[in-house]
């Protein structure tokens, strides 16, 4: 499975567009400000990484369900809820190529 932020696949020709696919990852560990800003920042970074990994796994699963070889035009959006949960959503276009 090729995952790319570009709209094309260099060296390949896109032969079929199967639609938009997405993946969402949520880190349910609430991030709270502690006495150490360094620890808080590390917790935020770890939470974002966990949510991003989960979102990419979900994106790839959804793309595999469509029997495609690639997802192009990927866009990653990272948000924090009012409760300081990290949410990562990823969207792209599922394609087959030759």
Residue ranges and their predicted role:
Residues 1-31, 64-65, 69, 88-98:
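N-terminal presequence-like segments and the immediate start of the first folded domain
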Residues 6-9, 75-81:
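Short, solvent-exposed loop/turn elements at beta->coil junctions and helix N-caps
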Residues 19-75:
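Short, well-ordered alpha-helical segments
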Residues 84-86:
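A generic structural micro-feature
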């Amino acid at each position: 499975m090729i995952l790319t932020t570009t709209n094309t696949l260099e060296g390949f020709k896109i032969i079929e567009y199967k639609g938009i696919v997405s993946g969402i990852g949520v880190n349910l560990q609430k991030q709270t400000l502690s006495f150490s800003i360094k620890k808080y920042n590390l917790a935020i970074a770890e939470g974002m990484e966990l949510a991003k990994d989960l979102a990419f796994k979900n994106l790839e699963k959804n793309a595999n369900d469509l029997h495609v070889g690639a997802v192009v035009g990927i866009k990653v959006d990272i948000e924090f809820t009012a409760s300081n949960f990290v949410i990562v959503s990823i969207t792209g276009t599922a394609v087959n190529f030759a």
